[in-house]
Regions:
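Long beta-strand-rich cores associated with HINT superfamily self-processing modules
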Residues: 676-709
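SH3/SH3-like beta-barrel superfamily modules
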Residues: 209-247
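Aromatic- and charge-enriched surface segment that lines or borders ligand/interaction sites
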Residues: 90-166, 259, 270, 305-307, ...
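Extracellular/periplasmic solute-recognition and catalytic clefts
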Residues: 354-365, 382-445, 463-469, 473-474
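Extracytoplasmic/peripheral linker and loop segments enriched in polar/acidic and small residues
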Residues: 35, 426, 433, 454, ...
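Append "and occasionally in soluble cytosolic enzymes with long acidic Gly/Pro-rich linkers
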Residues: 365-366, 448-567, 571, 655, ...
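N-terminal lobe/hinge region of extracytoplasmic solute-binding protein
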Residues: 45-95, 103, 126, 344-346
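Gly/Pro-rich hinge or "lid" segments in bacterial periplasmic/extracellular proteins
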Residues: 263-292, 299-303, 310-382, 388-391, ...
Length: 709
């Protein structure tokens, strides 16, 4: 069972943290005494309590350490962080990079023994894109043909002829007069209800009536009698589900007429000099939102076909990440709000969840149904949910865990661990590059004036950050992380067009292809004062008297950086700044709700591509916490997504990047480095640019001393 509360471990660590942090770190070859390992059990110190372990909802690095142990994908992350075959044994793509065919393993199983088939991917991608799911990862699904329109509720399947349109066509629905477009999946009342039903004579789009206050999920088509719809009403802990006759359901919009037009794919639409899409009228009952209209199909149980809006050479890179990992329909349908609890969860990865105690730990055991179970060396995995760096590193020091996740060590300890304070560099400490950027987000609804936001950005002297952070981080005015010019090879510098002494960094996307991210406002106190004066003139009495900065607890340098920014803005701009620390989950909810002025944030890329870092600033992105919305930024990214030439695509992305940074809804601060503590007996816990580890490769070597140099 998952139970809230503070564990005995956390209480015991309180005194331990004080004792370790209160004095200089003891010198030695290793950080703490190396315990005698259990060759079957791996203990991992995570950086906090996951917000979600549902792959479609998980978004933070804290979530993913658990998610990737439990759920498999078409591909998984290899030792270098790039995709390698997993549930998909092989794949091929069309010459225009718009159709991708994956051939699935026939021995893949869910943990309840059910076969894992292509239908599970179709279901999961439709669930990802469904507006009721409200996934912050939905942009990954927008690559799929009609994905964006499906989320927006504007793409429908026409169920009856409406000349010149024919039944079965995917159409875009437009309002007819003042009537809103019909939404076949939402009931226009206090409680939404998702419904699916196939056409039966003239009965198609329907609305259901459920008790007030109930929650909702998805209704699946099924059964021989098409006059029945399967509905799921999630009430209380588990909910109820079953079949309901269509005659018992409301259909308030079925008699409304709507303008409908053919929905061309984005490439065809762009090619038309004039909008010549056919338009007709249809009844609400003749329109239905169905997953079948998406560019996702399952020709047979072991073949999955994905069709995209435009050329998508990066699609394979997306197949390893959380949003495209399948979820079990059989568990989600029965327990929509509790399906990830140990007593209900059904998984597909190398490990199964047996115990979850909130703010304490996850207990996992080797899966007996995982297709690659013979390759899994561990019998047990314990993942501690330690939302405090000092507690995590202290538990490691005392032999309580075998490794820490990236950057779960206090910044003040890093110089000693690296041997930079005169002692010995600890052999179990690793520092490595990281495809991640740390920045401040600015709520553009609370601070709508771009001059004020630019003043904040120009007033920060980022050159002071390395001394504050102590971990080799790279100060940055660029959003997309990369490699400093001085650290690039001569050939890559030539490719990127950078001199060795350039203050900029660059991202080598692939061999022969380089992206130099656009720089944002750099430190310039005079320019900051000029922008501030313009802001005061434009805002007048609406100029804010105080600005708030929020950050999450658990990582000590978030507070240090906030105090540094507070001082910089006071000294260079004369602004009064209030600081507020919040627990991790509370902080996430506050930023999503827009309850902040300035907040700390970070983004770790899944693969080396600048769109990984720009997409969350799109107008409709569920993860757009800044509320920034710029039609020209949207247009440039839309055009880039459809551009088959990769160099021209990056040129368009660079223009969007520059426009975003000039508007300053975010303020880049530094490129992350990653810091790990890993016991010498741990094997296969890969340190790579994207910080993704596959626990199926991890093992414990009890004879490590014999192999040590």
């Amino acid at each position: 069972m998952r139970r809230p509360g503070q564990s005995a471990l956390a209480l015991a660590l309180a005194g331990l943290v004080a004792s370790v942090a209160g004095c200089a770190l003891p010198d030695g070859e290793w950080f703490g005494a190396v315990p005698t390992p259990d060759p079957t059990h791996f203990r991992w110190c995570n950086s906090g309590e996951p917000e979600y372990i549902d792959p479609l909802l998980a978004s933070s690095t804290t979530d993913l350490k658990v998610v990737y142990a439990l759920f498999d994908g078409l591909t998984s992350y290899g030792p270098d962080g790039r995709p390698m075959p997993s549930l998909a044994e092989r794949w091929e793509s069309s010459a225009d990079q718009r159709r991708f065919t994956f051939h699935l393993r026939r021995d893949a199983r869910w943990s309840d023994g059910a076969p894992l088939t292509s239908a599970d991917f179709v279901y999961s991608i439709a669930r990802l894109l469904h507006p009721l799911t409200a996934s912050r990862n939905v942009e990954a699904g927008w690559k799929v043909r009609h994905g964006r329109a499906y989320t927006d509720g504007t793409a429908k399947l026409l169920l009856a002829d409406a000349p010149p349109l024919r039944a079965g066509e995917v159409v875009e629905v437009l309002p007819d007069g003042d009537a809103p477009p019909p939404d076949s999946n939402l009931r226009r009342a206090r409680t939404p209800l998702a419904l699916r039903a196939a056409p039966d004579d003239n009965t198609a789009a329907v609305w259901g009536r459920v008790p007030a206050g109930g929650n909702v999920t998805i209704i699946e088509l099924g059964g021989a009698d098409r006059r029945f719809a399967y509905l799921h009403h999630a009430a209380g802990a588990d909910g109820v589900y079953g079949w309901a006759p269509l005659a018992a359901l409301d259909a308030p919009h079925d008699a409304h007429r709507y303008q409908v037009r053919e929905l061309l794919d984005a490439v065809a639409a762009r090619a038309l000099p004039v909008d010549r899409r056919r338009t007709a009228t249809a009844l609400g009952r003749e329109l239905l939102m169905l997953p079948e209209l998406l560019g996702v199909s399952a020709p047979d149980p072991y073949t999955l076909v994905l069709e995209t809006e435009g050329p998508t050479p990066t699609l394979l890179d997306l197949t390893a990440q959380k949003a495209l990992r399948p979820v079990p329909r059989q568990a989600v349908s029965r327990h929509p709000r509790r399906w990830t609890f140990p007593e209900h969860i059904v998984t597909s990865g190398p490990f199964q969840l047996t115990h979850w105690r909130q703010r304490d730990r996850f207990e996992l055991v080797r899966s007996t149904t995982f297709w690659g179970r013979s390759e899994v060396r561990l019998e047990r995995v314990t993942i501690y949910s330690l939302g405090d760096q000092s507690a995590s590193a202290s538990l490691y020091h005392q032999g309580g865990c075998d490794a820490t996740v990236a950057n779960n060590v206090p910044a003040a300890w890093l110089p000693a661990l690296a041997g930079e304070t005169g002692g010995t560099r600890r052999r179990d400490y690793t520092r490595a590059p990281f495809l991640g950027i740390y920045y401040y987000i600015v709520n553009t609804e609370r601070l709508p004036n771009a001059h004020l936001r630019r003043a904040l950005a120009h007033a920060l002297d980022r050159s002071e950050l390395p001394a504050l952070l102590k971990g080799g981080q790279l100060p940055s005015v660029q959003l997309t992380p990369g490699t400093p010019a001085a650290a690039l090879t001569a050939a890559d510098r030539a490719l990127c067009g950078l001199a060795e002494d350039s203050p900029l960094h660059a991202l080598v996307v692939e061999a022969g292809l380089c992206y130099v991210p656009a720089p944002g406002p750099a430190f310039d106190p005079l320019r900051a004062q000029e922008e501030l004066a313009l802001a005061r003139a434009e805002l007048g009495e609406k100029f804010p008297t105080r600005i708030g900065v929020k950050f999450n607890t658990g990582v000590e340098y978030h507070k240090h950086i906030a105090e540094w920014a507070q001082e910089q803005w006071r000294n260079h701009l004369g602004l009064a700044v209030d600081l507020e620390a919040q627990e991790w989950k509370t902080y996430l909810k506050a930023t999503v709700a827009g309850e902040y002025d300035v907040g700390r944030f970070g983004n770790i890329g899944n693969f080396p591509d600048p769109e990984e870092f720009l997409s969350s600033f799109r107008c409709a992105s569920p993860d757009n916490r800044t509320r920034y919305c710029d039609p020209e930024f949207e247009r440039l990214l839309d055009e880039a997504e459809l551009e088959p030439d990769r160099r021209r695509r990056l040129a368009l992305v660079a223009r969007a990047d520059a426009r975003l940074l000039d508007a300053a809804p975010l303020i880049p601060l530094f490129v992350y480095t990653q810091h790990h503590l890993i016991r010498p007996y741990v094997r296969g816990l890969d340190v790579n640019l994207v910080d993704q580890q596959d626990l199926r490769r991890v093992s414990i070597d009890p004879a490590w001393r014999e192999a040590a140099p």
